[in-house]
Amino acid sequence: MNASEFDQYKVDHLFLLIGENPLPNYVAARLLLNKGGTPYLVYTTGTKDPAERLQTILSNEPIGLKTAQLVPLNDYESDAYHIKEAIRPKLEAINVGKIGLNYTGGTKAMAVHAYRAVFSQHPDTVFSYLDPRKLEMCIDREDGDRIRLKVKPDVLQVKLAKLFQIHGLELKENFTQEAQLPELATALAQVFKDENKTKQWFDWYFNVFCEEARKKKNENWDDWKSKTKLAPLSISLEKLPSEVKTEFKQNNLIDPSGQLSLQEVQQLKTIEQEPVFKEIKDFCKYLDGLWLEHYVLKQVKNIAEKNSIKYYGLNFKVPLPGTQQGFEFDAAFTRGYQLFAISVSTTSKRELCKLKLFEAYLRARQMGGDEARVALVCCTNEPDTLKAEMALLDDKKIAVFGKDDLVDLSKKIEEWIKQADKDAR
């Protein structure tokens, strides 16, 4: 279903019932309002903030909408009389133009009473609902079956930053869209496929690299050493898997004595001649596990164009009231308006993997609603067992990729997307 197939259902005045998740309201406004049309945001005491936020966002959309009119119901979301009285003056003020009511966001009682209030005065109103399971805009009719319009990715592409903005969340900093040292990340993914090489990597990382570069506190690893102490370090590569050593060499990180030179890390540059790592400790963090996040980003980028993925990124840090750290999506992309969130960890520890997946699931549902999909990329040997243990979650909405999936991860992510499409049929 392309955008032109929505045209016959577009209106000049669209009443939207605002829910706790304003994303469906935003989608409905973008798909069903004519250029220069007017949104009417019908909200309760509990959804006042999302309504006011959506009013601001819609005013800045490229289709030149008129400023959204706010229609407060206060605490009367299930009171037929008050809903009718709130909507009636708005309807009476409309002299020209087609009218629509989209009741995706409201409670069932709100939807019923709003429908009756509008239908009694304007029976030719376009009544609609966004079905989150099937990704369809449904047009309800009194004289026939519901018309279903598939909201394909190319019909409406929602930026990740816009998705956060719709929920009143401002990113702490710009998210990453270019993978750091993707070839090194690929080499490490190859290493993790082999159990012996994985052990070899961890032996080198903990017993050689961390011993040189990291502080210890109560016999446990603490923060990285200071820049002045890290810069002069040359670290033995004797026990390192050859694939990783080759990538260090390709990036000119090996000194004449054949050791890893942390001084050379500062010379790494992007295509734009910007430093790959702001500080040496950022390279240390990369080896500590961030490499897998960058590997995931590269795999998403590899399949983006042919899968209608326009917006993707890494490290979405969001401040959250009442918390010190807020929350973070490791990786995410939107396909149309559907959010795909990916939690990433190099751990194989079952409980930690489950915790990361559960946290990502909750945040993704909060951001992307029922349409959101969530995956965990980790180093477990048993991804299917791990997924089965997450019985509380809707298994159609989650995926778990283990270490055997890493080498073919772009293909696995593509299959995940296709499965999401299949589930929406």
Spans of model-derived segments:
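Trp/Phe/Arg-rich N-terminal binding region typifying the photolyase-homology
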Residues: G105-M110
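Long, low-complexity, Lys/Arg-enriched
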Residues: M1-K98, V112-F327, R335-L339, T347-R350, ...
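Conserved beta3 VAIK motif of the Hanks protein kinase fold
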Residues: I342
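Short glycine-rich phosphate-binding loop at a beta-alpha junction
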Residues: K98-T104
